[in-house]
């Protein structure tokens, strides 16, 4: 699973995702993409599950780019622990995703195969998404 090799701080504030994506909202690598339509934290496990769903459906053909990276440590206190006594230990890593952000890109496969692969990937994610395709001119 994805996670940073090292970080400046062990724990992070919860934070909020305001407004639309300020970058990463255009296709840069592939012909097809999966765009987020809602703000949400996507965990490293969800990213990995989506990646596996895509690559298995495409039968290892084509190329996949993951455009988001889980760089935010999410901490959690153990169950049945009283309030207070400090913040919990880091439990997992997440990526903050704003609406409009391209999360995955595909290339080297037909459009119908790419659409189905990204539909399967979207089923693993907790947000509404949209399939996008590069416009030929």
Curated annotation (Swiss-Prot):
<comment type="function">
    <text>Binds 23S rRNA and is also seen to make contacts with the A and possibly P site tRNAs.</text>
</comment>
<dbReference type="InterPro" id="IPR036920">
    <property type="entry name" value="Ribosomal_uL16_sf"/>
</dbReference>
<dbReference type="GO" id="GO:0003735">
    <property type="term" value="F:structural constituent of ribosome"/>
</dbReference>
<dbReference type="InterPro" id="IPR047873">
    <property type="entry name" value="Ribosomal_uL16"/>
</dbReference>
<keyword id="KW-0694">RNA-binding</keyword>
<keyword id="KW-0689">Ribosomal protein</keyword>
<dbReference type="InterPro" id="IPR020798">
    <property type="entry name" value="Ribosomal_uL16_CS"/>
</dbReference>
<dbReference type="GO" id="GO:0019843">
    <property type="term" value="F:rRNA binding"/>
</dbReference>
<dbReference type="GO" id="GO:0006412">
    <property type="term" value="P:translation"/>
</dbReference>
<dbReference type="InterPro" id="IPR016180">
    <property type="entry name" value="Ribosomal_uL16_dom"/>
</dbReference>
<dbReference type="Pfam" id="PF00252">
    <property type="entry name" value="Ribosomal_L16"/>
</dbReference>
<dbReference type="InterPro" id="IPR000114">
    <property type="entry name" value="Ribosomal_uL16_bact-type"/>
</dbReference>
<comment type="similarity">
    <text>Belongs to the universal ribosomal protein uL16 family.</text>
</comment>
<dbReference type="GO" id="GO:0000049">
    <property type="term" value="F:tRNA binding"/>
</dbReference>
<keyword id="KW-0699">rRNA-binding</keyword>
<keyword id="KW-0687">Ribonucleoprotein</keyword>
<keyword id="KW-0820">tRNA-binding</keyword>
<protein>
    <recommendedName>
        <fullName>Large ribosomal subunit protein uL16</fullName>
    </recommendedName>
</protein>
<comment type="subunit">
    <text>Part of the 50S ribosomal subunit.</text>
</comment>
<dbReference type="GO" id="GO:0022625">
    <property type="term" value="C:cytosolic large ribosomal subunit"/>
</dbReference>
